Amino acid sequence: GKLDKFFGNNGSISSLTIVAPMVYNDSLVSVSIMRSVDVFDINSGIKQFGISVHGERNFSGGAPWGGAALDKTKEIVYIVTGNPLPSLYGVNRPGENKNTSSIVAFDLKKRNILWAFQDVNHDLWDYDIASPPIIHNLEIEGKLFETVIALTKTGNVILLDRNNGKPIFDLRYRKAPISDVPNEIT
């Protein structure tokens, strides 16, 4: 194809993404490493709105770089997020570091976060979710589940109800070993 000079700024938009954009109705959905989902008019390139992955926070990082999936019927974008920064040192970012190392669902119609599921709280091990989310209708024992699936660096398969972010199966969290780093809380 040819560059459309009337789209955005002489044929391009600034989105800082490494994830392929998705077409949604008359819009282009871009997942930005600046920690947001941005929606642009597909004809003009004008930004219609953006939804931030993180509100107020005490950390950096958590960028959605691993991939995204769009459920056009439900008008929901699912993303996976990176770990908080600095990656291996969390003294200056206490707490869970919400929405990092997570699967996050964005409601494009309501323009907000629908739900988030955090795989690793206060990630100190670079265990962010690096594989794109997969949307799949899965039949288990005769019952159909609308799921979003993500594979993790720890070898886990996260299987969630894509409507509410609840796990399909029971899961068990484990406490991390106590850190040897002064003032670090695991």
Language-model-derived ranges and their functions:
Residues 2-14, 46-57, 112-121, 166-186:
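Aromatic (tryptophan-biased) beta-strands that constitute blades/sheets of beta-rich domains
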Residues 1-6, 10-42, 51, 159-160:
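Mobile, glycine-rich extracellular loop/lid and propeptide segments
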